[in-house]
Amino acid sequence: MTMYVIKRSGRKEKLDINKIRIAIKFACEGLNVDPLELEADAQIQFRDGITTKEIQQLLIKTAAEKVSAERPDWTYTAARLLLYDLYKDVAHLRGYSLRDDLGKYKPYNRKNFYSFVKEYVEKGIYGEYLLENYSEEDFNKLANYIKPERDLYFTYTGIKILYDRYLVRDEEGRVIELPQEMYMLIAMTLAVPEKPEERLKWAKKFYDVLSEHKVTVATPTLMNARRPFTQLSSCFVLTVDDDLFDIFDNVKKAGMISKFAGGLGVYLGKIRATGAPIRKFKGASSGVIPVVKLINDTMTYVDQLGMRKGSASITLDIWHKDILDFLEVKTNVGDERKKAHDIHPAVSIPDLFMKRLKNREDWTLIDPYWARQYITRKIYDGKYKEVKPLPGSHYYVGIKEDGTQDILEPKGLEDFYGEEFEKWYLELEENLPSYAKKKVNSFELWKRLLTVAFETGEPYIFFRDEANRKNPNKHTGMVYSSNLCHEIVQTMSPSKHEKPVLDPETGEITYKKEAGDLPVCNLGSVNLGKVHTEEEIKEVLPLLVRMLDNVIEMNFYAIPEAEYTNKRYRAIGIGVSNYHYCLVKNGIKWESEEHLKFADKLFELIAFYALKGSLELAKERGRYKLFDGSNWSKGILFGRSVEEIEENSRQNGNNLPWRELAEEIKKYGIRNAYLLALMPTGSTSLILGATPSIDPIFARFYKEENMSGILPQVPPEVDRFYWHYKTAYTIDHEWTIRAAAVRQKWIDQAQSLNLFVDPQNIDGPRLSRLYELAWELGLKTIYYLRSRSAMDIEECEACSV
């Protein structure tokens, strides 16, 4: 009996086993796998009318199930089979043949690249800026530059995630582009700000580093560069003032940011505590928790077209009078009315608390409302007859002896760090009335914080004094908190509002607002599996700096404060992926002094060439607007003197010309106020087939369940380096913290530092020691405490690079 298969076009043809074998041969060629094994184990149950799609899916499934730590090459076989399927689907949709005029297999249609993009620009799926900035001739040149063979770099997990989440689809949900077309269109988008005569040159350079998997850009950039709405930034950090208008203005901002898939960090430390007065009515304030719940509910409501809930980290100071309730917002005990299960709590901790903790001394919780009243009056004491809050306003008013008034900027305890903070804290502790403060034992508070962290993985930790001491732009203000993933450390401030003014004739209402600093994360990362020598770093880092600077120009801004801050600071965040693989590839054990030396040498190179790239960009395009007065302008790099850095470089053996670089920076400036931030690289590491960010591997082989299904995970070259890969829950994480401290010397922002602890082999003192060591060694942040399966904690998709 003759059997027929149904092709994608709907046409019937005779079953030809040889065609299946050709597909299997293509998928297995050059790999350490047996094509006959795949053919036999697929056990295809042929029947009349079976579709070619069904046959292909069965082969993909069979190959994916064979992936293991001992036989990792099956991941490339499964990837090729999925690519083969994708090529056929896209060719059928776009109406071209997979064979050229000579019958040679050609998965990419170079001839019609321009007409393809033009069609989907007209349909509103690609952005008009592509046609506005590139001619048909440009498209043809770039189409011919595409390298289809680079598709073979993908693992099965990588291409599956790319297929499910990143490749652009039409209005019916069908994938319309191929991976190398995606990379080229992203490169073209990021090259739009370049001079027209140089645009193709930069598009090719950007394409090369992206498609060779040397770098990757943030999830929003991968998703939205080439689309009409170019929301390319990952995270945003809001500062909420103690004012009802500002609270709800920030709730609105949170909703708008979440609508366009941005992640959020929110600082609530300025808000008065429970029981504080409102307009002189005693005990009227409900405190911080209702605001936390407002943001929580906004994140769940603005669910990004039903795809996923928004994400927000909310930070409160450990001296805030509401801190005890705040620590419980995600626990399963206590009053459910005070819970906010969908936000990520973070705690800001000053040095003074850690000092008192060592001696088990008391700690005073303070209401920021009363602290602000006390400090503001004290600062202006002697200059005015009376200083009092201006009703309905952020400001205070100073009344002079002659009755004239000045508008005054208030200052709270949160507006100081280091010695100034300690001075004011001690004074408040001594002088505030009992209703404005509450005494607790520092150790008991710390113990509760760690217990909650052990149970839930959170709160994140923000060491505020170190963050502000090392802020290269401290001349512009304070850093109160970090972003959702706790790698961004930038100057921030609340916006200031004036009362709305009504025109009674027209009914027009005018709102005036002075924009504060709202940090924006423009992120990208370097794949250390492919880029770790000085020559490689020297080539790639300046390119990545340039790409991210162009993100700022191409970005769509959902809120004006974000654009204002982004254009003033031009902050970027360069991170890394494949760190663990880089170590094992170089024969370096995680728990070793060699690891620390390697990290020191490597991250000095990254820091130097990132700064060098930003310097060269400043020569070409101009320095960032707030450069004058910054540490960079004074020759202070990463919080250290040039002499100290030169000595460090000599010890590393790098001997880089830091003094020459510092002098050039003083003369020309740099383009970007902030440069380095080691973010998580969850989904984008999976696309690259890399180990995530700076984390150790979770296991040598496991299956991860996510939006793309159950996917096999193996680190790079696990068959070759099996015993070199030590897994996260078997590592002594004092080494992790020590390595992070070495890296931090070369990072102007922070690191998304996860700590992994085995519940069976950890106790309270040991856990406390890890956190205390992080503070002692000068870390700025701690991200998750992973005491459960890594798959149980939801990673921030927006920040993921």
Curated annotation (Swiss-Prot):
Binding sites annotated in the UniProt record for GDP: 219, 483, 487, 682-684
Enzyme Commission identifier(s): 1.17.4.1
Pfam family of the protein (one): Ribonuc_red_lgC
Annotated ATP binding sites: 7, 13-19, 52, 88
Catalytic center residues: 483 (proton acceptor), 485 (cysteine radical intermediate), 487 (proton acceptor)
GO BP annotations, alphabetical order: deoxyribonucleotide biosynthetic process
One of the record's GO cellular component terms: ribonucleoside-diphosphate reductase complex
Domain ATP-cone: 3-92
Regulation of activity: Under complex allosteric control mediated by deoxynucleoside triphosphates and ATP binding to separate specificity and activation sites on the alpha subunit. The type of nucleotide bound at the specificity site determines substrate preference. It seems probable that ATP makes the enzyme reduce CDP and UDP, dGTP favors ADP reduction and dTTP favors GDP reduction. Stimulated by ATP and inhibited by dATP binding to the activity site.
UniProt cross-references to SUPFAM superfamilies, sorted A to Z: PFL-like glycyl radical enzymes (SSF51998), R1 subunit of ribonucleotide reductase, N-terminal domain (SSF48168)
Keyword Nucleotide-binding: yes
Positions with a binding annotation for dTTP: 242-244, 272, 279
The UniProt record lists the keyword ATP-binding: yes
Site, as annotated: Interacts with thioredoxin/glutaredoxin: 796, 799
Keywords, ordered alphabetically: Allosteric enzyme, ATP-binding, Deoxyribonucleotide synthesis, Disulfide bond, Nucleotide-binding, Oxidoreductase
Feature type site, description Important for electron transfer: 783-784
GO molecular function: ATP binding; ribonucleoside-diphosphate reductase activity, thioredoxin disulfide as acceptor
InterPro entries, per the entry: ATP-cone_dom, NrdE_NrdA_C, RNR_lg_C, RNR_lsu_N, RNR_R1-su_N, Rrm1
Catalysed reactions, semicolon-separated: a 2'-deoxyribonucleoside 5'-diphosphate + [thioredoxin]-disulfide + H2O = a ribonucleoside 5'-diphosphate + [thioredoxin]-dithiol
Disulphide-bridged cysteine pairs: 235-521
Residue numbers marked as site, Important for hydrogen atom transfer: 235, 521
Family: Belongs to the ribonucleoside diphosphate reductase large chain family.
The protein's assembly and partners: Tetramer of two alpha and two beta subunits.
Free-text function comment from the UniProt entry: Provides the precursors necessary for DNA synthesis. Catalyzes the biosynthesis of deoxyribonucleotides from the corresponding ribonucleotides.
Protein name, entry field: Ribonucleoside-diphosphate reductase subunit alpha
Taxonomic lineage of the native organism: Bacteria, Pseudomonadati, Aquificota, Aquificia, Aquificales
